């Protein structure tokens, strides 16, 4: 049975909304087959797809430095980090797909400019120090933000964030 997303014109909307909010208040996770307000679903798609886009676009500046990293060890660290960032994007695209949007639609929205990604990745990484700054400041801030997201109310996003946070913390230590 397909999930029905709640819209205010539904006759039982207010009752379902009250139960939905009570579940969140109790700390329960909302799962893909559960009833949810349409606005909640739309905001999750916007937020998760932006996060996924940021992971994928975010690997580009570091990926460009793989061949120019100063040591073999640093090259290996960058390769692993870029690979993980691509994986993070995939986890997040999958979480968004559970809300009924296709990966193709998300990528089309990104390429058309309708969807966004973190603008920090628009700045050039002209030196190896720029890569260090990304690793220290940008990844450090992301870990703080993403740790909170691991506690979010939507189960697939929360579980993806638990895994992503563990990997991000590992990279931050390198």
Protein language model regions, located:
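Amphipathic, well-ordered alpha-helical segments in soluble domains
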Residues: 26, 54-62, 88, 138-145, ...
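Hydrophobic/aromatic-lined pockets within catalytic cores
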Residues: 67-70, 86-90, 97-101, 147-154, ...
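Internal, conserved structured core segments that host functional sites
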Residues: 120-173
């Amino acid at each position: 049975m397909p999930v029905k997303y709640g819209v205010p014109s539904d006759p039982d909307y207010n009752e379902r909304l009250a139960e939905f909010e009570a579940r969140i208040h109790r700390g329960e996770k909302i799962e893909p087959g559960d009833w949810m307000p349409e606005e909640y679903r739309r905001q999750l798609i916007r937020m998760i797809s932006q996060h996924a886009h940021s992971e994928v676009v975010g690997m580009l500046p570091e990926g460009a430095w793989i061949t120019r990293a100063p040591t073999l060890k640093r090259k290996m660290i960058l390769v692993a980090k870029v690979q993980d960032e691509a994986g993070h994007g995939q986890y997040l695209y999958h979480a968004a797909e559970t809300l009924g949007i296709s990966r193709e639609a998300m990528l089309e929205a990104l390429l058309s400019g309708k969807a966004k990604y973190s603008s920090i990745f628009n700045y050039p990484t002209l030196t190896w120090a720029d890569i260090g700054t990304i690793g220290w400041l940008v990844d450090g801030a992301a870990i703080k933000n993403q740790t909170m997201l691991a506690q979010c109310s939507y189960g697939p996003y929360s579980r993806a964030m638990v895994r992503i946070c563990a990997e991000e913390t590992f990279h931050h230590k390198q």
